[in-house]
Regions:
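Conserved catalytic-core segment of NTP-binding enzymes
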Residues: 127-264
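Conserved GTP-binding G-domain of TRAFAC-class P-loop NTPases and closely related GTPase folds
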Residues: 222-224, 230-244, 248-255, 270-306
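P-loop/Walker-type NTP enzyme "switch/lid" segment
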Residues: 44-120, 176, 183-196, 206, ...
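Hydrophobic residues in beta-strands of the RecA-like P-loop NTPase core, especially within AAA+ ATPase
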Residues: 41-42, 124, 229
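Acidic-aromatic/histidine active-site loop/patch
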Residues: 1-9, 302-316
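Walker A/P-loop phosphate-binding motif and the immediately C-terminal alpha-helix
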Residues: 3-45
């Protein structure tokens, strides 16, 4: 008899398209499945689902559209794949209503994620951008992973994504701690509180009510995103020297200093032509290029995730 219990949820997002979210999410799901974790990969890119292609699967007949429209449950549309321990839920394909679900439909979907029979871990492949649907899925997870490229535009978009996620999470907290007036003033680009960053906002709450400030900080500290730097060049990878993952470490440091967000580096993935070849062959990377450097790097990311506790908190 299968059991229903809360699975660990890992969300993979990015500040813009083309950073490699689907590469990371699909191969992370496969790596976890290889390690004995009963894994469910959910393509939660509600406007541009394509994880099935990276997995080498035909588009499933049943998708998230059926869940959003209440024709099926998430468990109903989770298909068995050819890969051991891996099930898959396809995103909504060419369905405008499913790409923009209303609040009740979204909450119904969120409640089902993580409560599918016989699943240890759920990996969510998110859409790009800072829409509320994407942010809510990102914040739902026990572990939130942000994929970024070593390029100024990608780094800038990643900062914007994390800042948007911070304020989205704070919007829930404000109702509990009565800080709506502070947030209302702070949302103005030029405001009397001198708030320009999330760190400034927390300081403003401290000034208004130190006790509430401590409680809000404790709540927000649970938002501890992990960073994965993709397509890193040799100088960004290093070989055990001081420059090892320096771009990613600098970004994590900036998140802590300027945004007040305790981001941590989860992994650095090398630029590798094996990715392009695998997509063209419609095969998962770990099957198409099992000895590639990027496959080994993705395996290391999976191992780190299994070794560390989940810091996030799934929304009710």
């Amino acid at each position: 008899m299968t059991e229903t219990r809360s699975a660990r949820i890992i969300a993979v997002g990015g500040g813009k398209g083309g950073v490699g979210k689907t590469l990371v999410s699909t191969n992370l799901a496969l790596a976890l499945a290889d390690r004995g974790q009963r894994t469910l990969l959910v393509d939660a890119d509600l406007g541009g689902a394509n994880a099935h292609t990276v997995l080498g699967l035909a588009p499933p007949l049943s998708t998230l559209s059926d869940v959003v429209e209440r024709r099926a449950t998430l468990a109903d549309v989770a298909v068995v794949t050819p890969y051991r321990n891996l099930r898959f839920v396809s995103g909504a394909l060419d369905d405008i209503s499913a790409a923009n679900p209303n609040h009740s439909a979204k909450m119904r979907l969120l409640r089902q994620i993580g409560r599918v029979d016989g699943v240890d871990v759920v990996v969510l492949d998110l859409g790009a951008g800072t829409g509320f649907n994407t942010l809510d899925f990102f914040l739902l997870a026990h572990t939130s992973v942000l994929v970024v490229l070593p390029e100024p535009t990608s780094v800038e978009n990643a900062y914007r994504f994390l800042k948007a996620a911070f304020f989205r999470r704070l919007a829930v907290v404000e109702r509990v701690y009565g800080i709506a007036d502070v947030l209302e003033v702070a949302r103005a680009q030029r405001n009397s509180l001198g708030v320009h960053t999330p760190a400034d906002l927390l300081a403003a709450i401290d000034r208004k009510n130190p006790d509430v400030g401590r409680q809000v900080r404790a709540q927000m500290a649970r938002f501890e995103p992990r960073l994965v730097l993709n397509q890193a060049l040799p100088g960004e990878l290093g070989r055990g020297g001081d420059d090892d993952g320096q771009v990613a470490r600098d970004m994590a440091s900036a998140c802590r200093r300027f945004l007040g967000i305790p981001a941590r580096v989860l992994g650095v993935l090398p630029e590798d032509d094996a990715v392009r070849r695998a997509v063209r062959q419609r095969q998962p990377l770990r099957l198409a290029a099992p000895e590639s450097a990027i496959k080994r790097a993705l395996d290391a990311v999976a191992d780190r995730l299994l070794q560390e506790p989940a810091h996030g908190e799934v929304a009710a």
